[in-house]
Amino acid sequence: VIQVKYQRFLAGALASLASIAVLAGSATAQTAVTKGGTLIYLEQQPHTNLYPPAGGFYPNGGVLNQITDKLTYQNPKTLEIEPWIAESWTVNADATEYTFKIRPGVTFSDGTPLDAAAVARNFDTYGLGNKALKQPVSEVITNYKGSEVIDPLTVKFFFTKPSVGFLQGTSVIGSGLVSLKTLALPFDALGDATKIIGSGPFVVKSEVLGRELVMEARKDYKWGPAKLAHQGRANLDGIKYVVTPEDSVRIGALLAGQANVIRQVQAYDEKQVQSKGYIIYAASTRGVNNTVVFRPDNPLVSDIRVRKALLHATNAKEIVATLFSANYPQAKSIIASTAQGFVDQSAKLAYDPALAARLLDEAGWTIGPKGLRQKDGKELVLQAY
């Protein structure tokens, strides 16, 4: 037996899911385009920081996606990388040089141009970080060497080693483009949404930090992803984010008609909202699945046999079937099934308690008097947060 002390353990780590939201309206109403008005969106948690590489945290990404554009767009159906702020691009044979042609006429909401120089500064920051401003390196950019502005609308990026994932990296939330004024701010100042100047379809109008955020549509927006059917400014006039931590309060507000969209619906609440005609949108990640991550400096799990034993001792199928719904499919790999390069690794992730026990025996962890595995006087007891 391995004991795990749960502090704030996310059981969803065993599932392949990005986030679940509920949309007001029926399936037929969803096809009708609403023009004008302000969408009321209830968010479970407040955003923490809007430095674009911090966009992997859902509340951060939800804001950044509305106020920033990306160099490229990944089609969610085909997974192809398509033009957005970049009209076109070329990559050399060993993927160490990328050249992008920038769409003309794009501006940030402060009126400054989103040109090659601005793109270069963004990726120099994301690829190298800025120690003076405490801005960290983006997790999706590796081997970055630097940039060169070829002309006002052409920028070239250089890498120390082949970086085949960079093109896809330019399409993710964490690569949102912001103005030079925003990039000049220290990391700690970027939690203030009113200071984030992007080129996206919405701009921040006001904020009550940690409680409420109001956005308004940018009337002159006309540079969305080139292949999308809708072009031009957003159909909505605005979006109002309201931080509402309690699950029951969010659902109650939705059912009472006080909200249009709520994020984070627990599996046990899904039937309730669906029975009222609401639409559940459960988008899976197109990158890395939710995972349990071990600290490599923890001596209890430094032996790979112990980590493998934990994997095979966990009945993920039973957990998903008991605690979740069909919207939480069991992960078949560290990479999502909708991501490029996915390979089904189910056989290597299988529940096998006999194998887990054998691995622990081989690693020297024997069963003690309490029924817990122990070694050198220490019990195999882990804390998970």
Question: Which residues make up each language-model segment?
Answer:
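N-terminal lobe/hinge region of extracytoplasmic solute-binding protein
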Residues: L42-A93, D124, I197
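Short, well-ordered beta-strand elements
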Residues: K35-Q45, E87, E97-F100, V119-F123, ...
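Bacterial N-terminal signal peptides that target proteins for export
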Residues: I2-L14
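Extracellular/periplasmic solute-recognition and catalytic clefts
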Residues: L128-G129, P136, S147, K205-E216, ...
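Append "and occasionally in soluble cytosolic enzymes with long acidic Gly/Pro-rich linkers
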Residues: K219-K222, S302-Y385
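Aromatic- and charge-enriched surface segment that lines or borders ligand/interaction sites
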Residues: E87-A132, I150, K156-F158, L300-S302
